[in-house]
Amino acid sequence: MHINWKKITIITLDLIIGTYLVFAFTKFNKPDEANLVCTKVNINIQDEMTNGFLNAKEIKKRLEARKLYPLGEPLKEVNARMIEETLKTSPFVKTAECSKTQDGLVDIYLTQRMPIVRIKSISNEDYYIDDHNQIMPNTNYTCDIIIATGYINKWYAKKYISLLSKALMTNELWRNQIEQINVLPDRGIELVPRVGNHIIYIGNLPETNLIDKREQAINDFVNKKMNRLEKFYKYGLSQAGWNKYSYINIEFDNQIICKKHQNS
């Protein structure tokens, strides 16, 4: 069998040259990591335009205060893990991720805790409850959510008022109409609407030690009460006038008890 050494030599040389060219192209076109600096910082916050407390300006300010804002810094000295851990110390941050790219970009991705109700109790406590029924501290920022006042301790706020607020917010009508929850000494619940000069009394929330059934029980309770109120709004107040009554009691089934304003 005749071996064509010339052909084999040519093929081998072609392979060597091809491999070298690929290596050289990759090597000389790759950025010099030692001299690469951060040219842009992308701060992405999930739900930034809703009722959260975070914005890109605040995040930049927080990182600058810790001397961790990466813009203009050598990329090799940008500590992505430290940036993540620093941002996670904020009581308003749920998750934080930071990554670097070879073209000098630093990307920061945040998800935030979303407040669903603000608590202003009779004992002068002032804080928020988030969408996971956990306490958030007060802040200089405000957002358009329900305020709960009255006889509220932190246990009741987390276990019941947060669920009541969620139930109201899931309905577009009540999300726009109800602006305040007031808890009486016996835990009876009053609702203060945006439209209409009256107070709505719905009674006591159903209480249970079964966590998995508590939310459903409160949802059913709220839906039942507010469906009746919606019908009363539609067929009663629309005829009598929105400011005719000062107190509307929908605690009991099959009846609505109203108290007129003194000048009505």
Cite the ranges covered by each PLM segment.
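Charged, solvent-exposed interaction patches on well-folded alpha/beta domains
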Residues: 1-89, 94-264
